[in-house]
Amino acid sequence: MRFSGFVSGLGLGLLTAVSASPAAFPAPASIPDPIPAPVAPASPAIEERAAKVTVAVPSGTVVGSSSGKVDSFRGIPFADPPTGSLRLRPPKRLSKSLGTFDASGLSAAACPQMFISSGGQSVITEFLSDFLAVPFLTPITGQEDCLTITVQRPAGTKAGDKLPVLFWIFGGGFELGSSAMYDGTSLLSTAIDQSQPFIYVAVNYRVAGFGFMPGAEIKKDGSSNLGLLDQRMGLEWVADNIASFGGDPEKVTIWGESAGSISVLDQMVLYGGDASYKGKSLFRGAIMNSGTIVPAEPVDSDKAQSIYDTVVKTGGCSGASDTLECLRGLSYDKFLNAANSVPGLLSYNSLALSYLPRPDGKVLPKSPDVLVATGQYHAVPMITGCQEDEGTLFALFQPNVTTTSRLVEYLQNLYFTQATKQQVTALVNTYPTTLSTGSPYRTGLLNEVFPGFKRRAAILGDLVVSLTRRIFLQAAANSNPDVPSWSYLASYDYGTPILGTFHGSDLLQVFYGLLPNNAMRSVRTYYFNFVYNLDPNKGVTKYAKWPEWKESKKLMWFETANKNSIINDDFRQDSYEFIAANAGALVV
């Protein structure tokens, strides 16, 4: 099937169904224009938006902006620019005084990004980006000098208020994304309205080849998993500075989505569970939206080494006596092109990521699943969950994988090179070929855009998010039975053609609050309760009690945009049991 024809059909189908079905994305009563109409310079509103606010921090003064209910301080540097000789090295704490720093700009600069794939796949990506407005599908321009923190707080907050802190880690497959995509104003407005004010912090970290370059040379240099180290230094900055903004450094909850959610788990297992800084814990709670453990091969495995070797070859460094130093010496554009010469997230390889956190014996001593199973992690109360149709978005890029044999070959060659063909075949066979059992779920014979799509979407979603979530929860309950956890399944976008309640749709509902419905209000309330009390049920109590997962293996089901239920966490149990029993072979 030609991609252009497929995309045209996808676009027509989505537009038709969304306009006709209240189960998809019903339009709110009023949506503001994306580009507001010009306002006369003398307008008092302009003066209000331009108001400045200052905060004295240990290394200087930060100047932010104040608008309505929220003060914003965007793009505060927490590390020296990772450029030149600092490229492909662990972050170096800011070595100079901050002085008076203007953080009143509109956004913080992004780190260098993975290119959107060329060819037919880019047509799909461009359409999805335009139609769905999912941040990690939106191309952005980055720069190497990008290690910054953004802080937002309720207007009028002052040092000593000791508000709890919500530390956001963006997603994007460890290849895309930036803190600037995630303004916390909507979250803070809701929290303020229900008397649960907090401090919102968003960290920038290096992605793709700049932040997660693998290879034996990288391991030997001690320069693996740099993006995770950037996040960790951001947390340390919070410990040192957030009190000046009115936050409590002892009440930090880390929250992420997709790769950001996986990063939250990785922060829990970093250094074998050592999350201390200056004798205190860097965070006391964790929220993970769509991502937990990703069993991975070592940073110097054959699979990982092939990525490094490709980058070296593309960068013209193959003949160098020190290939890593050669990469550091390349111009920005040349290194960017070399780093992006390997397959990306939005390509045929899809979730078989080129760049991701990998065990290195130090930062990640072992694969995250092993660290959790053996209790080598910072065990804190946590919420974790998934969207019902996590895999649909990523199953769009393999229209030729139409048979069981091709699916087995695809998974074994790109995902699970350590598994035998028999193991991969047995895994695939736990997923029926009947259309009614595939994803998007509960849609009968509908949405099979090409042969094998719904089955593959089910498998990809389970392997990377949905069922690994259950494996993680069980392992954590076994290792630390006294630490509470809560889990959820979100289906509030049921009826969205082809995609269902897809990966990233929680950003639209929960983070941005696109629609002021029950899904948005209840999830935010549960989360804000957790930020305050480490329990989603304590605080604002107008919603049903969310049962702890370990007590009953039950999920909070955000069933529709206007209804929540409690269900058993037992869907696709045969597949779950197989994945759990073969976790050692199913590593990426």
From Swiss-Prot:
Expression induction or repression: Expression is induced in planta during the fungal infection process. Expression is strongly induced in minimal medium supplemented with wheatgerm oil, but only weakly induced by olive oil and triolein. Within the promoter, a CCAAT box, a CreA binding site, and a fatty acid responsive element (FARE) are required for the basal expression of LIP1, glucose suppression and fatty acid induction, respectively. Expression is regulated by several transcription factors including MYT3, SAS, gzzc258 and gzzc066.
Pfam families in alphabetical order: COesterase
Keywords: Glycoprotein, Hydrolase, Lipid degradation, Lipid metabolism, Secreted, Signal
Main location: secreted
Keyword Hydrolase tagged: yes
Entry annotation: catalytic residues: S258
InterPro entries: AB_hydrolase_fold (IPR029058), CarbesteraseB (IPR002018), Carboxylesterase_B_AS (IPR019826), Type-B_Carboxylest/Lipase (IPR050309)
Protein's UniProt keywords contain Acetylation: no
Membrane-crossing residue ranges in chain numbering: none
Role, per record: Secreted acylglycerol lipase required for efficient utilization of saturated triglyceride lipids. Is not involved in virulence.
Name of the protein in its database record: Secreted triacylglycerol lipase LIP1
